[in-house]
Amino acid sequence: MKIYGEKKIWFVTGSQHLYGPGVLAQVAENSQAIAAGLTASEHVSANIESRGVVTTPKEILDVCQAANSDENCVGLILWMHTFSPAKMWIAGLSALNKPYMHLHTQFGAALPWGDINMNYMNLNQSAHGDREFGYIGTRLRQERKVVVGHWQKESVQIQVDDWVRAAMGWAESQTLKVARFGDNMRQVAVTEGDKVSAQIQFGYEVHAFGLGDLAKACEKITAEQITAQLELYKQDYEIDADVFTDVHSLEMLQNEARLELGMEAFLEEGNFKAFTNCFENLTGLSGLPGLATQRLMSKGYGYGGEGDWKTAAMCRIVKVMSLGKAAGTSFMEDYTYNFGDPDQVLGAHMLEVCPSISNEKPKVVVERHTIGIKKDIARLIFTGTPGPAINISTIDMGTRFRIIANEVDTVKPPQDLPNLPVAKALWEPRPSLEVAAAAWIHAGGAHHSVYTQGINLDQLNDFAEMAGVEMVVIGADTNVNEFKKELRFNAVYYHLSHGI
């Protein structure tokens, strides 16, 4: 079983009746073999299901409409084994509301130089059949991924999976529900936004709830459930014995167990896969959830602090896109700088950083929370795993959305941080803090982000194209002046592309 379970990609091959039944039978057989080969690949994370050969406008429309109505089909891979006149594809592609990838390949890798004849040439026409098909996609102004190369090549299979993972993220976005407990942090701008526009653009829903609703869910948690939860904490984390012997510390840990179980029950009942809260809206709760939120993120929930529903949604989407990967994804904030050689960013938050970003065993501690509220709260302490990562910010530009991505290199802190009672990661932005921070600020990037080592820029770009959203990248080659030009050009393009 592939990691995405019943969710699958349909493999559809284009041809026409010009070639006769013998050729079409061979086309169908080869198509089955390619779909099976991709499914069998260790590099492809979902089942690729062959849906046969389409040879007429009606067959094409039928398969596109069938894909639209199949909830387990998250996208299509389209390939022209022979020549397939592209006017036949207009109705189907116009009706298709799921993403598709154009695989420009052919069944055999090498030409049989001594045996090649016109029968071979007529059967293996993707070199020009895919160009005909590509024209109509461009003519229809459709965003799609184009992968070129032999289907058995590892690099091709990896590109296919990049798109598959983006399609899984897009499918998740279409059904995602975000629960907001309380509202945004007062007077904060970037966490605001148009939720109706977001639902139109991304598909996900955002629903607000009073703290009383969540408090009721937490009140239903029994002492037995809390005791069982504490046993899980003992298994999963390092916890000093005095946390359990000190009455106050034990109470703080029990508070987190109650909050975790209460929030999870609430989210499960409403089919919510992401949530936000705010330290300014805690009436009826024992405190700001720390360990509770960290554990929910580690289970796959998206999270955004201070009511940041855009980051919560993207956090969940990226977690789905990176399913099965060892590297993690978390809500994050650029917290403070180390100006040195090189300049570095210490990322953290009040409490809520996901332990999936660390290879070390987290430690549970009870420490004083001094921002917004003053209360002892149990939380996990750990340091992010060194290696390449991406910080992702989704912002509302007023008339549209923008995704900003900054490549960073996470490093081991040069010294221990014994007095810092929160989880953290230390990174060096590419190309430098000076350039990256300036570009981020010019682009309007938030102080919150989704920090991930689980996806790459190609996957994120594929997702942005599926969503029809601008994406700008801050990386090794970024120049601030050129980046500002890109922002200006994009502003014109996206304004005109949506019509006057």
Swiss-Prot record:
<feature type="binding site">
    <location>
        <position position="306"/>
    </location>
    <ligand>
        <name>Mn(2+)</name>
    </ligand>
</feature>
<comment type="function">
    <text>Catalyzes the conversion of L-arabinose to L-ribulose.</text>
</comment>
<dbReference type="GO" id="GO:0005829">
    <property type="term" value="C:cytosol"/>
</dbReference>
<dbReference type="GO" id="GO:0030145">
    <property type="term" value="F:manganese ion binding"/>
</dbReference>
<keyword id="KW-0119">Carbohydrate metabolism</keyword>
<feature type="binding site">
    <location>
        <position position="333"/>
    </location>
    <ligand>
        <name>Mn(2+)</name>
    </ligand>
</feature>
<dbReference type="Pfam" id="PF02610">
    <property type="entry name" value="AraA_N"/>
</dbReference>
<dbReference type="InterPro" id="IPR038583">
    <property type="entry name" value="AraA_N_sf"/>
</dbReference>
<keyword id="KW-0054">Arabinose catabolism</keyword>
<comment type="pathway">
    <text>Carbohydrate degradation; L-arabinose degradation via L-ribulose; D-xylulose 5-phosphate from L-arabinose (bacterial route): step 1/3.</text>
</comment>
<dbReference type="InterPro" id="IPR024664">
    <property type="entry name" value="Ara_Isoase_C"/>
</dbReference>
<dbReference type="InterPro" id="IPR055389">
    <property type="entry name" value="AraA_N"/>
</dbReference>
<dbReference type="GO" id="GO:0019569">
    <property type="term" value="P:L-arabinose catabolic process to xylulose 5-phosphate"/>
</dbReference>
<dbReference type="GO" id="GO:0008733">
    <property type="term" value="F:L-arabinose isomerase activity"/>
</dbReference>
<comment type="similarity">
    <text>Belongs to the arabinose isomerase family.</text>
</comment>
<keyword id="KW-0464">Manganese</keyword>
<dbReference type="Pfam" id="PF11762">
    <property type="entry name" value="Arabinose_Iso_C"/>
</dbReference>
<keyword id="KW-0479">Metal-binding</keyword>
<protein>
    <recommendedName>
        <fullName>L-arabinose isomerase</fullName>
        <ecNumber>5.3.1.4</ecNumber>
    </recommendedName>
</protein>
<keyword id="KW-0413">Isomerase</keyword>
<dbReference type="Pfam" id="PF24856">
    <property type="entry name" value="AraA_central"/>
</dbReference>
<dbReference type="InterPro" id="IPR009015">
    <property type="entry name" value="Fucose_isomerase_N/cen_sf"/>
</dbReference>
<feature type="binding site">
    <location>
        <position position="448"/>
    </location>
    <ligand>
        <name>Mn(2+)</name>
    </ligand>
</feature>
<dbReference type="InterPro" id="IPR055390">
    <property type="entry name" value="AraA_central"/>
</dbReference>
<feature type="binding site">
    <location>
        <position position="349"/>
    </location>
    <ligand>
        <name>Mn(2+)</name>
    </ligand>
</feature>
<dbReference type="InterPro" id="IPR004216">
    <property type="entry name" value="Fuc/Ara_isomerase_C"/>
</dbReference>
<dbReference type="InterPro" id="IPR003762">
    <property type="entry name" value="Lara_isomerase"/>
</dbReference>
